[in-house]
Amino acid sequence: MAETDVGSVKGKEKGSGKRWILLIGAIAAVLLAVVVAVFLNTQNSSISEFTGKICNCRQAEQQKYIGIVEDCCCDYETVNRLNTEVLNPLLQDLVKTPFYRYFKVKLWCDCPFWPDDGMCRLRDCSVCECPESEFPEVFKKPLSQYNPVCQEGKPQATVDRTLDTRAFRGWTVTDNPWTSDDETDNDEMTYVNLRLNPERYTGYIGPSARRIWEAIYSENCPKHTSEGSCQEEKILYKLVSGLHSSISVHIASDYLLDEATNLWGQNLTLLYDRVLRYPDRVQNLYFTFLFVLRAVTKAEDYLGEAEYETGNVIEDLKTKSLVKQVVSDPKTKAACPVPFDEAKLWKGQRGPELKQQLEKQFRNISAIMDCVGCEKCRLWGKLQILGLGTALKILFTVNGEDNLRHNLELQRNEVIALMNLLHRLSESVKYVHDMSPAAERIAGGHASSGNSFWQRIVTSIAQSKAVSGKRS
């Protein structure tokens, strides 16, 4: 009887030992899976997903978006209301008009910083410019017979060059000191229909994509991190960060969920991971929106009287009416008369020096757009950087309202880029405002799921110890 009891005890100990081995093995497998998932997620970062870690900038503490937008003259609640009720509907209609639908751009690569990106490397590099005989006659100047386009990534990154028969009236050609890629009529420029090439996910990933944002941020982030930085030195970082956030928002809002079935939709997890979880990125998005809005409203007289002729009289009159509504809306003027106060900048002895420094840095960022290896990313990058450069030109190049009325000259392409950029930012602000609760619920659900899983593991271990203790 005693031997039987001893054997029974030994059998129980062996059974308990096996359970512990299985439990430890399961935990090890889970940990390995987590490490692999994190590694793969890191490897899959794209141009829209790069978080600017090179900057090591201090992240703001979590807070709700209430009160005045930092360095601006409007509060979040007013911005959201005006954007939803007034600006966004007007801008949606405006960018669909013939004048604002077409953008002239140099699409082929001419990277001045790293020569290896000037060559096609991936499987979708075969997109080429059409022969001259295939171009619509409305083009102001013919393109060269053959120009290979540098293209990286996937088919969804390809620019659709389809145009309809619209004519353009040329505007004054002037130099923009803030950009390196001015509107110059030459064989490298082509018109692109922006409605056929929406800003969305393209599959542009890897070292080339990460290097773009690293190069952009390295031009200005060190100026921002210093505790003693003045407001002028922080502006460029905030503008770039806000634009970066907007790009990420558009990719998350129109994402390729299933490549096999070509299923597109919202990726709210990406929205949270790349934008919402970092309050400073949301704040900088609002800052950039108000900065560009200030430039548009400051140029009210110029934009309101400009010619928007494309050969379609009805559409052209509609365009002019929409522009006037955007730049002089009474609700906007009453609630947010000065979205951003540029008059307080460039004061003191260092003012001119800081301004020249900012111009040089932004020109470098503008030149980096030629290094983008994804054709659609390059298109929207060039358009939005030109739009931001135009806003800087309006606010900082011509001093005073009187001088602005007499001395401001904008290229047609600058006006197209400026209004399309304002629309992109408006869409991003609206999407963040509308979808933040849902995205945060999803993120919270994932966190709760993870916590519940690990809690089950800990509970299982505790229960095993308790059972083992009772059996011993």
Swiss-Prot record:
Keywords on record: Disulfide bond, Electron transport, Endoplasmic reticulum, FAD, Flavoprotein, Glycoprotein, Membrane, Oxidoreductase, Redox-active center, Signal, Transport
Subcellular location: Endoplasmic reticulum membrane
GO MF annotation list: FAD binding; protein-disulfide reductase activity; thiol oxidase activity
Name of one Pfam family that matches: ERO1
Family: Belongs to the EROs family.
Cofactor(s), names only, from the UniProt record: FAD
Membrane protein topology class: Peripheral membrane protein
GO cellular component, one term: endoplasmic reticulum membrane
EC number(s) recorded for this UniProt protein: 1.8.4.-
Positions that bind FAD: 200, 202, 213, 241, 244, 274, 281
Signal sequence region: 1-37
Protein name: Endoplasmic reticulum oxidoreductin-2
Chief localization: endoplasmic reticulum
One GO BP: protein folding in endoplasmic reticulum
